[in-house]
């Protein structure tokens, strides 16, 4: 029997990082020491008090189904956190999801329609470089993509506002803003966000503000897009626990949005994942309320690593755009970036991610969610192999 697959799935390409991941796995299986700078997760343990809160919740019997949109205690804690950021959401305007990725997926599915008869669907505007799953989510929802390249502007949005204005129109259904950015680490300033606001209001566009890295910044304070005049009613704020609290495997995130969007996304949520894991949500309450010191320790470590990496590359006469947030650096590379990454892995045994995976060829993304010793080793190997 030959299965006939849905067009929406056929439109999605396999991850551009798959070849790198498979090659790294083969090398490790052969006993090769791979310096893995491709990983997008913190290398710190989850704070001990959060782990204990999760254990305690299991001991107390919180192992059954949770309310679909989230337990009241966590939704209230999220609303309090957002209020501290200047965002006025009621607890009922929050959906707790198994990871921020699910929150994004539900948002795309709730807002984007495919075109009639297989034609172009609703327009989604991405700012490149853009996290790899935005494109896939847009395609799975039937959307058509429009992309604005920020690489010529040092990955900053403000100098590219004219280009963004050309991309956004009355036909645009959704604009995705990720600040701090994965993969560039750029944090968009108030002038850039004001430009986004003006375009969104003028063209009646909904904006997704993906703020998953908002706790990991260096000398700048990110502004939440929904705090700007005219944006509360047209912004879906997405965040999660994976990056700030080193809880990637716990799978916990959320969206906050106007009540009508929450009602529609809630239908998708209840008919797909049902709910985020019950005891994990109790751990999330602890993370939001009692981890300031641990979060700052991780942030400071990332900043120290960033500074070290920038200096190491400068020692080899390589200038890299200095990120203001997240834990990635975009390294300019010559030629085909996919081939460069594969060769760097095969020959220098350093794993990185090609910039083309994010819509920006000519770069490799390096994660500094690794020890300083491994980061030094990685740069030394790249230099010795003439990759710098």
Please identify what each model-predicted range represents:
Residues 2-8:
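Short, contiguous pre-domain boundary segments
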Residues 47-55:
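Glycine-rich loop at the start of a catalytic domain that most often binds anionic cofactors/ligands
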């Amino acid at each position: 029997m030959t299965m006939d697959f849905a067009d929406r799935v056929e439109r999605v390409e396999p991850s551009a990082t798959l070849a790198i991941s498979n090659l790294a796995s083969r090398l490790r299986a052969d006993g090769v020491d791979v310096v893995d700078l491709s990983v997008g997760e913190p290398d710190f343990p989850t704070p001990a008090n959060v782990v204990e809160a999760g254990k305690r919740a299991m001991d107390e019997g919180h192992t059954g189904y949770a309310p679909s949109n989230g337990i009241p205690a966590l939704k209230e804690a999220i609303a309090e956190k957002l209020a501290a950021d200047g965002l006025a959401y009621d607890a009922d305007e929050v959906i707790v999801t198994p990871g921020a990725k699910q929150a994004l997926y539900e948002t795309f599915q709730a807002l984007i329609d495919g075109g009639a008869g297989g034609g172009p669907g609703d327009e989604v505007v991405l700012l490149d470089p853009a996290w790899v799953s935005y494109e896939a989510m847009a395609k799975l929802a039937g959307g058509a993509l429009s992309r604005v390249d920020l690489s010529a502007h040092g990955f900053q949005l403000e100098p590219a506002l004219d280009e963004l204005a050309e991309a956004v129109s009355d036909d645009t259904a959704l604009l995705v803003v990720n600040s701090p950015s994965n993969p560039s680490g750029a944090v968009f300033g108030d002038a850039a966000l004001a430009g986004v606001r003006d375009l969104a209001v003028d063209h009646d566009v909904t904006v997704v503000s993906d703020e998953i890295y908002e706790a990991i910044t260096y000398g700048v304070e990110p502004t939440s897009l929904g705090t700007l005049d005219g944006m509360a009613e047209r912004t879906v704020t997405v965040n999660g626990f994976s990056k700030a609290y080193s809880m990637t495997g716990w799978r916990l995130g959320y969206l906050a949005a106007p009540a009508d969007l929450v009602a529609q996304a809630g239908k998708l949520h209840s008919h797909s994942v049902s709910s985020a894991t019950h005891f994990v949500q109790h751990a999330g309450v602890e993370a939001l309320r009692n981890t300031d010191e641990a979060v700052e320790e991780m942030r400071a470590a990332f900043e120290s690593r960033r500074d070290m990496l920038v200096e190491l590359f400068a020692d080899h006469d390589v200038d890299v755009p200095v990120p203001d947030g997240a834990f990635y650096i975009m390294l300019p590379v010559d030629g085909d970036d996919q081939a460069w990454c594969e060769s760097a892995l095969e020959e220098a045994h350093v794993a990185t991610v090609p910039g083309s995976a994010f819509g920006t060829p000519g770069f490799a993304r390096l994660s500094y969610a690794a020890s300083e010793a491994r980061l030094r080793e990685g740069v030394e190997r790249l230099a010795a192999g003439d990759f710098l």
